[in-house]
Amino acid sequence: MTDDDRWDEDEWVSVEWVEAPDDEDDEGDDEQSAPVPFTYDATVGPDDERTADVLRHGDVEVLGAMPWSSNGTFLVQVTCGADHLPAIYKPERGERPLWDFPGGLWKREVATSLLSDHLGLGLVPTTVQRDDAPLGAGSLQAFVPARFAEHFFTIRERDDVVPALRRLCAFDLVANSADRKGGHCLIDEDDRLWAIDNGLTFHTEFKVRTVIWDYAGEPVPDDVLRALDRMLGEPLPRDLADLLDRSERDALRDRAGAVLAGGRFPHDPTGRRIPWPLV
C-alpha cells in the first residue's frame, strides 16, 4: 500500500473519552471533551478465524463513547493472550428501544452476523454475545478499519463494489433490515464491503427500509439464491436460532422463500421504504 492509499486525518473515526484524563494541570481544559483521533491496531481482522474467540474470551477495556449514536455505543479494546483488536460494544442497558423493536437490539446485531456467516456472504463483521462486558450484556463487533469518508452514495457506481452491494441488498431483504442507511455500508482499505448497525432486523412484519433500491427488477445473484436454497433445506444453526423466537424464525424462512421464489429484487411502489437520515 502506498502513502496515497493510506487514510488521511479526515477519514479517521473520532471517539469521545468516557472520562477525562486524570491530570491536574489540564483541569477545566475544554479540549478534554473534544473528539480524539483513533489509530487502528489489531492482530486479527473483522472475520479472521480467531476473531470470534478473542471477542468472546478477551479482556474488554472501554476506550470511549461513539458520537452520534442513538443508542449507547462504545469503542473498546479486546485483548486475549497475544491477540488484540478494537471492537464496537453495544450494551443492552444503553439501548433506547423503539415501539416496534423492544429491548435486546444487541441480540439482533449478533443474529445478523451469524446469518451472514451461515449464508456464506461475509458481509457483517464478526459479532458475538458478551454477558460479562463492563456495562453488562451486549454485543461485541469487530471494528472495521474503513475509509470513513466513503458510504453507499460514494461507492454505488463502482464496478468492483456493485456485486457485493447486490448481495447486501438481497441479504437485507432476508434479514428484514429496517435501517440500512448509506453510512452503514463501509469500505475497508482492501475495498471490501461491510454492513454495520444491524440492530433493527428480524421483525416478524416486513420492515425493510434501505437506501439500496438500485437493483429493483433485476435478478438476485445466483450465489445468494443457492445459499437461500441450502438454508431452507436444513435447520438453522443453534446459536442463530436461540437468538430469535419461533415467530421470528418462521418469518425469516418465509422471507428467504419469497426471495428465492421471486428471483428478482422488488420495487418500492410507495417510495417511502427508506431510512432517515439517508447517511
Predicted regions: what they are:
Residues P46-G64, N176, A261-R272:
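Short loop/turn hinge sites at secondary-structure boundaries
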Residues T2, T39, T43, T51, ...:
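Residue-identity detector for threonine
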Residues D53-I155, D160-V161, L165-A178, G182-G183, ...:
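Conserved ATP-binding subdomain of kinase catalytic cores across diverse folds
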Residues D10-L55:
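Juxta-kinase regulatory segment immediately upstream of eukaryotic protein kinase catalytic domains
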Residues V13, D29-Y40, P145-C169, A261-V279:
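Repeat-unit-sized solenoid/scaffold elements
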Residues P21, P35-P37, P46, P86, ...:
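Proline-rich intrinsically disordered, low-complexity coils
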Residues D3-D23, E27, T79, P102, ...:
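C-terminal catalytic region of ATP-dependent kinase domains
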Residues M1, V36-T39, M66, M231:
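Detector for methionine-enriched segments
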